Each structure stands twice: as C-alpha cells, then as structure tokens.
Amino acid sequence: MVAPSAEIDLAPYIDHTLLDPLATPAAIAQLCEEADRYHFATVCLAPIYVRQAVELLYRRTPRVCTVIGFPTGAHTSAVKLYEAQEAADHGATELDVVVNLGWLKAGQTEAVHQEMAEIVAATGVTVKAILETTVLSETEKRLAAEICLDAGVSFLKTSTGWRGGATVADVKLLAQVARDRIGVKASGGIRTAAQALELIHAGATRLGTSRGVDLIRNRDTLEGETNY
C-alpha cells in the first residue's frame, strides 16, 4: 500500500525537466528558479543550456543534468563521448545517456558496454543509463541493466519519455538488478503525487518529470503533461 503523500518529501527525488526543443533561455531561467525554490535534485535540460544553468545555480542546491544521445541513442560513440565530455566541461554533474538500442537488440553487448564505460571513465560525473524499457523485452531489460551496471553507471533510468513512460513493473525490475548498489530513475508520464509515491515504493530513487512544481503544489491528478 502506498504511504500517504505527507510522509515523503517528493522534492529531493525530482529531476526538474525541460527537454522541449522549443525551450528558450527564459524558460530555462524559470526552470532553474523553480528548482532552487523547491529544492529539487537537479534541472534536466538540453546540452545547449548547461552553461546557463550552471551560472544560474551557482552555489545553489540543485545540480545540473543534461541528456546525451537523446532521444534515440543512435549517435556514434565518438559523438556521444564528445557530447558527454563537453557537457561535463561546461559544468554538468549528471548525464542521462541513451543506450544504443539497435546494438542491444542485435546482441552487440560488448559495444553497448564499451560505449557506456568510456563515457563513465572520461567524464567522472554521475551517469544515468537510459534503457528505454518500453521497447525492450523482459530479457532485454535485465540484460541492458546488467551491462550498464557493469560499465559503472550511477543510475538505471527507465525511459526518455518519447516512447512511453515509467511503469511500476519496470522500476521493480531495475531495482532488483541494482540491489541498492546504484540508483533507479523513473521517467516519463509521472502525473500525480500518488503515482510518484508508487514508483518510489517500487524502488525509484529519482523521478524525471516536467511537472515537478505541480506535483509539489497540487498533489492531485494533472492534465496535459508532456512525457519528457
């Protein structure tokens, strides 16, 4: 049974997210202000806005997170590595990296492992592996999670939100693989505080949502959420 929402402070779990390609610098400034006001874990935004966010959140609690190889994961390893290193050089301390799903489905597990391990080693920051669980079989989900865990990532993340969102079942599976050694991030379609709490009780240690402020303010059903 999910505990009453008053028992858990949702704010420290939230990656306050704005990955809309139409996002403007003004919208990013608002995102950062909200994250600081509500003490969210991070702001999660496109690489182009990392420097702006780092400046705005200097000496503030929220960290700066960006996405790598987003949303398809189908960039070359060299491009992903460059993107990750540049983001870290610009001050991002968390990177959400999309796994190469084509390689995974083709059984090219060494390539998946090497790509993720190189990013972890080269940047030295928190790396979250986005597995896109909504398009994977049960076996593929577990395999992807184990590969990324072995590659040294700090979190297993369910999804980009572009192909569906987090489910309780997927969070439980990732938590089983993680076994408290690394974190689990649930992302995509998180609309209510009750849903957020259910995911936390399933094992999520971080929540990616574009509706963090509404979750904190309203704690009831939200309409019209974007899924990323």
UniProtKB/Swiss-Prot annotation:
UniProt-recorded Gene Ontology molecular function terms: deoxyribose-phosphate aldolase activity
GO biological process: 2-deoxyribose 1-phosphate catabolic process; carbohydrate catabolic process; deoxyribonucleotide catabolic process
UniProt keyword annotations, A-Z: Cytoplasm, Lyase, Schiff base
Pathway stated in the Swiss-Prot or TrEMBL entry: Carbohydrate degradation; 2-deoxy-D-ribose 1-phosphate degradation; D-glyceraldehyde 3-phosphate and acetaldehyde from 2-deoxy-alpha-D-ribose 1-phosphate: step 2/2
Superkingdom of the organism of origin: Bacteria
Entry's localization field: Cytoplasm
Swiss-Prot/TrEMBL catalytic activity: 2-deoxy-D-ribose 5-phosphate = D-glyceraldehyde 3-phosphate + acetaldehyde
Active site: 96, 157, 185
InterPro entries xrefs: Aldolase_TIM, DeoC, DeoC/FbaB/LacD_aldolase, DeoC_typeI
Chief location of this protein within or outside the cell: cytoplasm
Record-listed E.C. numbers: 4.1.2.4
Gene3D superfamilies registered for this protein in UniProt: Aldolase class I
Keyword Lyase tagged: yes
GO cellular component: cytoplasm
Top-rank EC class of the record's enzyme: lyase
Protein task: Catalyzes a reversible aldol reaction between acetaldehyde and D-glyceraldehyde 3-phosphate to generate 2-deoxy-D-ribose 5-phosphate.
Family from the record: Belongs to the DeoC/FbaB aldolase family. DeoC type 1 subfamily.
NCBIfam families referenced in this protein's UniProt entry, alphabetically: deoC
Protein name per the record: Deoxyribose-phosphate aldolase
Organism of derivation: Cyanothece sp. (strain PCC 7425 / ATCC 29141)
